Amino acid sequence: WIMGHMVNAIEQVDEFLNLGANAIEFDIDFDKDGIAQITHHGIPCDCGRKCTKKAIFTEYLDNIRQVTTPDDPKFREQLVLLALDLKLQRISSAKAYRAGEDVAKKLLDHYWQRGNSKARAYILLNIPLVEDYEFIRAFKDTLKNEGYESYNDKVGINFTGNEDLDKIRDVLEILGIHKQVWRADGITSCFARGTERLKEALKKRDTPGYNYINKVYAWTLVRKSIMRRSLRLGVDGVMSNNPDRVIKVLKEKEFADKFRLATYNDNPWEKFRG
């Protein structure tokens, strides 16, 4: 999975897909009451990027629904995964449950259209810190209460704050989540980061019977040397400001026979068995 990073303006979706991304990440900003308002990162952000691009969240969902719906004029077959970077660290943890309700309802109304949409992308909920785990509980409660629990099959969970892996496991255990879990490891492209935690996450992913990590990706990679390092370690995905660079690295002799771009037929919730 090549995840285009910080794709917050509607016009950026095609831009990143044209560069080779098959997944996009966008930031969701909330008001003080936990209501999702806009797709927006804000300052500071990655080096060399404009931090202020934005869209109204519901309008963004309306557009991305078309882009991921077969037979729609806007359909782009390669886009198979949407990563929602939930900016919950900007609001009180007491509002995390309300935020989960709101995002679930907006996905129901504007993306899935309560069963009337054929939009097919998988959804990855990126939560910054484990302290905001009530977002997940609310999201799942809302799907159940609204009568659309089946959409859980399309939704995965990821904590992105580089927290202790065992601490994350404990929270997932509290929530009763033992599948459809991704793990991210990384830092803004402005800085370098070691591989200790990334290696630990990959080791846990590959441990038989360990059900708290199905996929691991590294972020935000812009240098080809770091992309190569991550691929050698065996990541499932790379988040980048430059998907075209990832494509070029994947075509190199060292990687061409080991990796390929994920398609809709690849289940993002299953561990890869090479």
Swiss-Prot record:
Mg(2+) binds at residues 25, 27, 85. It comes from the Eukaryota. GO terms for molecular function: lyase activity; metal ion binding; phosphoric diester hydrolase activity; toxin activity. One of its GO terms (cellular component) is extracellular region. It is found in: Secreted. Expressed by the venom gland. One of its GO terms (biological process) is killing of cells of another organism. Gene3D superfamilies: Phosphatidylinositol (PI) phosphodiesterase. Dermonecrotic toxins cleave the phosphodiester linkage between the phosphate and headgroup of certain phospholipids (sphingolipid and lysolipid substrates), forming an alcohol (often choline) and a cyclic phosphate. This toxin acts on sphingomyelin (SM). It may also act on ceramide phosphoethanolamine (CPE), lysophosphatidylcholine (LPC) and lysophosphatidylethanolamine (LPE), but not on lysophosphatidylserine (LPS), and lysophosphatidylglycerol (LPG). It acts by transphosphatidylation, releasing exclusively cyclic phosphate products as second products. Belongs to the arthropod phospholipase D family. Class II subfamily. This is Dermonecrotic toxin SdSicTox-betaIIB1ai.
